[in-house]
Design a protein with these regions (language model features):
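Core catalytic alpha/beta fold that binds nucleotide/phospho-ligands
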Residues: 1-99, 103-196
Length: 196
């Protein structure tokens, strides 16, 4: 998938019920050992699946995922982002671009916490359940891209027909970020790529 004339590799996939053996075959030995320490089978799947997906996307340029001090996944010479929901996993890779992705399933519970992340000026663009999930996903994407403090009131999002326009307020300075999105039947996906 191409965004802003830069190669972006993006993949979203529904989680299988059980961990397929071929997911394990692509893991480095250290990754296999790390995964075996995870007692919960669903968490093992969440560990293995994005690594399998990244290996498939990157072929020989795949390298081990390392997490920085903020818990953000990184890979040598490439910007990556990983997102999990209950039933989906999404990964994105960018070369010479910082990337972020978020996948969210439509769920009613978001209505109970909307007051924590919806700004007054966003209420006209984002008022249905699907819109609120899209807004949440956009703010998660901005958070992942900027490594900002997780105060979603510092993120503003406007919706156009084809894109989302995000604004991150940091120490009185606003930075604009263009995001793409896809609305599926059961989930929405938001991603972005910005120059390094």
């Amino acid at each position: 998938m191409r965004i802003e004339n830069s190669e972006i590799l993006l993949w979203v996939e529904e989680k299988p019920a059980e961990l397929p053996q071929h997911y394990l075959s692509v893991l480095y030995l250290r990754e296999q050992e790390e995964m075996q320490k995870i007692p919960n089978k669903n968490r093992q799947l969440e560990y293995a699946m994005p690594r399998f997906m990244l290996r498939e996307l990157l072929n020989n340029s795949y390298s081990e995922i390392i997490y920085d001090s903020n818990g953000k996944p990184t890979m040598a010479n490439q910007s990556i982002s990983i997102s999990h929901s209950k039933n989906y996993v999404a990964v994105i890779v960018g070369k010479n671009k910082n990337v972020a992705v978020d996948v969210e399933e439509y769920r009613e519970q978001v209505m109970n916490v909307a007051h924590k992340f919806v700004l007054a000026e966003e209420k006209t663009d984002f008022n249905s359940l699907e819109d609120l999930i899209l807004l949440w996903s956009a703010k998660e994407t901005l958070f992942k891209l900027t490594n900002a403090t997780p105060d979603f009131k510092k993120f503003r999002v406007k919706k156009t027909d084809k894109h989302l326009c995000g604004e991150v307020l940091n120490e009185g300075v606003a930075k604009s970020i263009k995001m793409s999105y896809f609305r599926g039947e059961k989930y929405c996906l938001v991603w972005t790529a910005s120059p390094i």
